[in-house]
């Protein structure tokens, strides 16, 4: 099926395009042109001045539509994923919060099943925790927090290939062995919920930590201990060339001035915008969510 979208502000790598059109065939973009002349055989959609952008890839989202991916049920996965699809995502990496390994295995089974479906928007599983610094736990449930245990993560990663990213605190005992192993499996490993300073971040990057999750949040910046001043995790990540970052760019988790600083120092190629969405995202019900 051929579809032509006209009369919208089109975002391209070169900037905004007006009075152009986007030609789509079977869900794939064929062409972006500066002409809005009708294409023979195409169904025309009038965007009525709205913004036209490529589909988003949601790389850090814990849930949506009233469900959390950590529920590890097919209903939760489908409902949360559909909530994000309705708001512009075309691909998603469902994110688990700190939980038991029994629940992680259940989520893996669900994820693998759904990824086998034709044109599945689920691209792989993302795990945050449970190997987190309890001092920096934030909203992560501390009842599951622990240090990395190879007797847990190696059997899991030998069993499945659906896990594409795993975030932990790099200063924990065993974190470096964890990162070396996940890197050998092609899994992106990120620092998160951490108070690591420069030497720890530098060492973590060397063994495979390549990304900083929800940059600035759940990690300290420049600080003072007695009369001495120290760089925090934030400055350490800035100083680590090659380490990418993600920011929750909702204007609440970080102010616009900090977002500008991230853009200036890390650049567009090393910065991702994420929602870190919870079950409440795109929830249309009236009842509280458990």
What is the predicted role of each segment?
Residues 127, 135-149, 155-231:
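Divalent metal-binding pocket/active-site signature
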Residues 81, 105-112, 153, 179, ...:
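Generic structural signal for well-ordered alpha-helices
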Residues 100-106, 171-173, 186-198, 248-265, ...:
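Active-site glycine- and acidic-residue-rich loops that bind
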Residues 73-76, 107-110, 149-151, 227-233:
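Charged helix-capping and loop-helix junction motifs
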Residues 15-24:
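A conserved glycine-rich beta-strand in the N-terminal activation segment of trypsin-fold
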Residues 62, 66, 78-107, 120-133, ...:
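Divalent metal-dependent hydrolysis catalytic cores, especially in the metallo-beta-lactamase
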Residues 200-290:
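Active-site-adjacent C-terminal substructures of enzyme catalytic domains
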């Amino acid at each position: 099926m051929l579809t032509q979208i006209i009369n919208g502000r089109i975002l391209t790598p070169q900037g905004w395009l007006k009075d152009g059109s986007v030609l789509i065939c079977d869900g794939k973009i064929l062409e972006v042109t500066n002409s809005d002349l009708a294409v023979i055989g195409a169904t025309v959609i009038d965007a009525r001045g709205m913004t036209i952008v490529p589909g988003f890839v949601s790389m850090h989202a814990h849930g949506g539509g009233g469900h959390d991916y950590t529920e590890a049920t097919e209903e939760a996965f489908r409902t949360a994923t559909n909530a994000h699809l309705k708001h512009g995502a075309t691909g998603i990496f469902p994110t688990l919060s700190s939980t038991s390994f029994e629940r992680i295995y259940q989520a893996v089974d669900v994820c693998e099943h759904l990824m086998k479906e034709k044109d599945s928007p689920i691209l792989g599983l993302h795990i945050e925790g449970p190997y987190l610094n309890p001092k920096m736990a934030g909203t992560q449930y501390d009842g599951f927090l622990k240090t990395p245990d190879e007797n847990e993560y190696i059997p899991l990663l030998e069993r499945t290939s659906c896990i594409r990213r795993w975030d932990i605190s790099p200063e924990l005992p065993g974190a470096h062995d964890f990162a070396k192993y996940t890197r050998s499996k092609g899994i992106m490993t990120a620092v998160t919920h951490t108070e690591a300073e420069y030497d720890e971040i530098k060492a973590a990057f060397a063994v495979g930590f390549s990304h900083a999750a929800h940059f600035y949040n759940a990690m300290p910046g420049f600080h003072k201990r007695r009369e001495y001043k120290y760089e925090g995790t934030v400055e350490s990540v800035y100083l680590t060339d090659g380490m990418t970052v993600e920011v929750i760019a909702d204007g609440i988790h970080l102010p616009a001035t900090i977002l500008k600083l991230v853009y200036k120092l890390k650049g567009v190629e090393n910065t991702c915008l994420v929602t870190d969405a919870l079950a409440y995202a795109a929830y249309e019900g009236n009842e509280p969510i458990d």
